[in-house]
Design a protein with these regions (language model features):
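Membrane-anchoring hydrophobic helices of lipid-metabolizing enzymes
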Residues: 1-79, 89-91, 100
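Soluble catalytic domains of membrane acyltransferases
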Residues: 56-192
């Protein structure tokens, strides 16, 4: 996971360098250290998301009951805002995996580098290349097939983390416009 960086999806050198700088100052090394510790502990992959919450010292508080509000079988699409980046995915996967193991999250391809959760991720490639477009079409097909088989798909419909338009002003972060993919996927598969 040494190559774990979102900069690899950017095509120009300035963007790659900028992303690497932001990653450095926003805790990437700490996350890498925590992940390396996790690997040494030889924990069960089924508990990865719960273990990640513990390692990050996050206390997840919800206003619903997992076992009552998440169906134990049948296809389901979980649609969520993406306000906090990695924390959103870790939290949602922890909630879902406490009830079921037949789930996958549609997310950035770089996150598949974590071996413990590789099979839980349907990768999206944001590079915009011809190969990326073909891979993303395959990702959509994989999500459809998984839902038709009765699984759960977790999706962040804006496809991006909420951001501030001006980091120097006291504005709230805004979620990007939601893409139509989640709605189309629901209609195409009759998922809940």
């Amino acid at each position: 996971i040494n190559a774990f960086t979102f900069a690899s999806s950017e095509v120009n050198k300035f963007s790659q360098t900028f992303i690497k700088i932001v990653e450095f100052f926003s805790g990437k090394l700490t996350l890498k250290k925590l992940y390396d510790q996790y690997l040494l502990e030889n924990n069960s992959p089924e508990n990865f998301w719960h273990d990640a919450l513990k390692k990050l010292r996050l206390n997840l508080v919800t206003n619903f009951h997992f076992s009552k509000d998440i169906p134990i079988r049948g296809s389901l699409i979980v649609v969520a805002n993406h306000a906090f980046g990695v924390v959103d995915g870790v939290s949602i996967c922890s909630i879902i995996s406490s009830v079921r193991q037949d789930y996958k999250m549609i997310t950035h391809k770089v996150l598949r580098q974590a071996e413990a959760v590789k099979d839980k991720i349907i990768p999206i490639d944001f590079s915009g290349t011809k190969e990326a477009i073909l891979n993303n079409i395959q990702a959509r097909k994989s999500a459809e097939d998984f839902l038709k088989d009765g699984g759960i798909i977790i999706i962040f419909p804006s496809g991006t983390i909420a951001t501030k338009s001006n980091i120097f002003k006291d504005h709230k972060a805004d979620e990007g416009d939601w893409k139509q993919f989640a709605a189309k996927l629901t209609l195409k598969t009759n998922a809940g």
